């Protein structure tokens, strides 16, 4: 039986770890993402979910900083934010996280996601944004697909984490 493990999230925009409130950055800053990752490690977290909000929303990126977080902290990292293509999966994995979390938008090219899973195995997880029983991808890519059909395809492709 698999075990549920909750991952604390570090959302990064403009080089700072930020607090989100209902999806908005209005809640303020936590400061350095490296310091936040270290504090989660000291509190006993085995993993963090590290998100590049700027890349996810198409307003820049924080790749160098996130690579430093991955290198300089002992906590295991699931990297997320703007990972919507095979090239983005490869670039994300090259930064050194344990795994990347592919955005729902990438499912508009589900064959590419399945090929990446075939190449990288459990290092590729898939995020599904769902409303009811339909995908609800930001930007409309893949929006409206039946979640159960998508789960069937991902399961057949060997996706271990959704």
Residues of each region from the PLM?
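Short catalytic helix/loop segments, enriched in acidic residues and glycine
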Residues: 23-41
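Catalytic domains of carbohydrate-active enzymes, especially glycoside hydrolases
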Residues: 35-51, 95, 156-158, 162
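Glycine-rich beta-strand-to-loop/alpha-helix junction loops that act as flexible
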Residues: 51-53, 78-84
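Alpha-helix-loop-beta-strand connector modules within alpha/beta enzyme cores
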Residues: 58-81, 111-130
């Amino acid at each position: 039986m698999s075990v549920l493990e909750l991952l604390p999230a570090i959302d990064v925009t403009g080089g700072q770890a930020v607090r989100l409130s209902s999806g908005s950055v209005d809640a303020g800053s936590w400061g350095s993402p490296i310091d936040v990752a270290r504090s989660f490690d000291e509190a006993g977290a085995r993993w963090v979910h590290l998100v590049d909000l700027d890349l996810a929303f198409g307003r820049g990126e924080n790749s160098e900083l996130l690579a430093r977080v991955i290198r300089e902290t002992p906590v295991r990292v699931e990297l997320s934010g703007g990972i919507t293509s095979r090239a983005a999966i490869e670039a994300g994995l090259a930064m050194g996280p344990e795994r990347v979390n592919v955005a729902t938008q990438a499912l508009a090219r589900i064959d590419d996601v399945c090929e990446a899973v075939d190449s990288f195995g459990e290092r590729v997880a898939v995020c599904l944004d769902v409303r009811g029983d339909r995908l609800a991808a930001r930007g409309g890519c893949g929006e409206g697909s039946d979640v159960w059909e998508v789960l069937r395809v991902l399961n057949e492709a060997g996706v271990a984490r959704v």
